């Protein structure tokens, strides 16, 4: 389409700088009004492209297939903010969707060659669900269709040695102190539902990571079909100075230009490595330090099984505590139970294969070793509940990962010029609170809101520093709480004292016993109330209860069908399913019941 010279002059005058941009809620720009007066109504789409382009030449070569919904949104003088995102994980995709919905021009650079179904379930607490709903109603509704609620059921801590009938630590009564027939109960229950109800938020639960990523990718493609470039990771950047943007260096040797680079490329981030002058993936001789991370002191084994336990529908997740280790189980939907076994082992104590992070894949140390039997041997004398879960798990599906984390970056900003890091790149977390993905989603939302307030690229550096200041206190608290949970369970807790047996007689056992009321009535309520206190939607009224009721019926149907299938065909588990990468296709295995 050709425009008259007077129209071009008018448009150029309206867009005083090709680098200027305003929030997406600005209604009608000068350029829009001027263009409308110069062209007929049948070129409305082109007039919007003019406002979003740097030059008239760009108008005639605008990429086909751009979503008309985006073009119909309130206009920006000049052009949209151009954002490059390193990494197409949960944090990167959430950031992309947030920014695309605000009219930014976003490209995600992802190392994997193509999207594939990989990775295990991910927990979303009430705070993250509030953010997801605020980002997009359709996104939230689609996630709820794939969601499994755990926070509406009993969740908490059990004694790993007494949790099958002899446990005397009831929540609401002191009968266990003198009555050996007092019913077995939980050591501590988590107030997940009560804290969610306090703020009127959806309840904590899980969703399979592949389902989540597929939904995020689909919602992004509705706005910009070619928003993601697969098979081309970010491996560095060159800052061009204030207001001049950043050159993004890609793995294939090419470069890309952007106003902002977001490093969402995980714990071994290449963007972070350059920002902080770290040698990427460099590991110390003793294995305890790696690219600014410290070995947490814990290794974790993971597995999944389809199993109908006696309390399957009544419990969400359980943490079994014992000397120098703990064992976690969670309902993850469709009759499946996901489990994690944490041990205080030195780094490099590798037994099982792992594909976590894309660089730590290795074969099983001893292919002939039965990993389930190995883990059972480390839980001698533990509850039959733990043994039943392990016995039903195909040994081939077991995986392992050494856990690394970082101290909060209180003295170093997450931003360098027009480059910023989010998620695990700057605040990796121990998995105990299930807040790793949640905090990455909070990052995505806050960063997008902060950048939307900018009116010029000259202000971007300050905006990124503002983002860091907005997030550092909350993220640091959550990081410390996550680490403290592991340290307490492993180093301070032991089998609780009971007057009815000799299982817990050490000083740690007495300490654990006296921790019970403090944890139940003070620490855990305060902890979860703080986590859920960030909820941009505000209260959702009766919606959380409606969602849970709708899910409950379907959950029973799906689970019973899975139990019937296992009864007939045995366990069928995709492995690796937790820590694998897209380059490593899943292998389906079956373990027929005897």
Residue ranges and their predicted role:
Residues 100-120:
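Glycine-rich FAD pyrophosphate-binding loop
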Residues 56-84, 143-145, 155-177, 181, ...:
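C-terminal helical "tail/cap" subdomain of flavin- and related membrane-associated enzymes
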Residues 208-211, 218, 268-315:
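Central beta-strand plus flanking loop segment that forms part of the substrate or channel wall
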């Amino acid at each position: 389409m050709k425009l008259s010279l007077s129209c071009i002059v008018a448009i150029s005058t309206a867009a005083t700088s090709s680098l200027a941009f305003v929030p997406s809620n600005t209604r009608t720009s000068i350029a829009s009004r001027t263009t409308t007066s110069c062209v007929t109504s049948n070129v409305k789409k082109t007039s919007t492209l003019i406002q979003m382009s740097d030059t008239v030449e760009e108008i005639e070569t605008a990429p086909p297939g751009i979503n008309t919904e985006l073009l119909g949104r309130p206009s920006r003088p000049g052009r949209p903010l151009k954002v490059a995102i390193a990494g197409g994980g949960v944090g990167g995709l959430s950031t992309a969707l947030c920014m695309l919905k605000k009219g930014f021009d976003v490209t995600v650079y992802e190392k994997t060659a193509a999207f594939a179904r990989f990775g295990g379930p991910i927990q979303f607490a009430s705070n993250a669900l509030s953010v997801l709903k605020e980002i997009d109603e359709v996104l939230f509704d689609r996630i709820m269709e794939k969601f499994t609620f755990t926070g509406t059921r009993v969740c908490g801590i059990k004694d790993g040695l007494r949790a099958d009938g002899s446990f005397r630590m009831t929540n609401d009564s002191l009968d266990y102190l003198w009555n050996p027939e007092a019913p077995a109960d939980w050591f501590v229950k988590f107030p997940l539902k009560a804290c969610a109800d306090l703020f009127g938020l959806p309840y904590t639960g899980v969703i399979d990571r592949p389902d989540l990523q597929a939904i995020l990718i689909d919602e992004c493609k509705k706005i910009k079909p070619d928003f993601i470039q697969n098979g081309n990771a970010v491996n560095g950047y060159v800052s061009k100075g204030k207001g001049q943007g950043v050159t993004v260096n890609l793995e294939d040797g090419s470069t890309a230009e952007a106003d902002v680079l977001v490093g969402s490329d995980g714990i071994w981030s290449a963007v972070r490595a350059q920002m902080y002058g770290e040698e990427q993936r460099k590991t110390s001789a003793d294995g305890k330090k790696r690219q600014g991370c410290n070995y947490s002191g814990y290794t974790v084994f993971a597995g999944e099984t389809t199993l109908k336990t006696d309390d399957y529908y009544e419990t969400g997740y359980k943490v079994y505590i014992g000397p120098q280790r703990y064992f976690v189980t969670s309902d993850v939907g469709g009759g499946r139970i996901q489990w994690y076994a944490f041990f205080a082992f030195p780094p490099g104590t590798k037994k099982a294969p792992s594909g976590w992070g894309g660089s730590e894949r290795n074969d099983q140390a001893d292919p002939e070793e039965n990993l389930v039997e190995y883990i059972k041997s480390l839980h001698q004398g533990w509850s039959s509940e733990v043994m039943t879960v392990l016995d039903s798990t195909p040994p081939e599906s077991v995986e392992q990962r050494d856990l690394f984390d970082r101290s909060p970056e209180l003295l170093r900003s997450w931003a360098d010029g027009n480059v910023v890091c989010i998620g695990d790149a700057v605040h990796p977390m121990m998995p105990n609170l299930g807040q790793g993905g949640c905090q990455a989603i909070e990052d995505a939302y806050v960063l997008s809101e902060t950048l939307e307030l900018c009116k010029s690229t000259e202000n971007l550096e300050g905006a990124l520093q503002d983002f860091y200041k907005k997030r550092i206190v909350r993220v640091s608290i959550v990081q410390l709480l996550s680490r403290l949970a592991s340290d307490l369970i492993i180093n301070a807790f032991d089998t609780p004292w009971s007057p009815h047996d000799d299982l817990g007689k050490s000083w740690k056992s007495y300490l654990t016993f006296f921790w019970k009321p403090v944890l139940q009535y003070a620490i855990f309520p305060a902890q979860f109330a703080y986590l859920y206190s960030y909820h941009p939607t505000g209260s959702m009224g009766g919606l959380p209860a409606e969602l849970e009721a709708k899910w409950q019926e379907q959950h029973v149907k799906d689970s019973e069908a899975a139990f019937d299938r296992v009864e007939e065909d045995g366990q069928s588990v995709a492995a690796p399913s937790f820590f694998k990468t897209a380059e490593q296709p899943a292998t389906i295995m079956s373990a027929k019941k005897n």
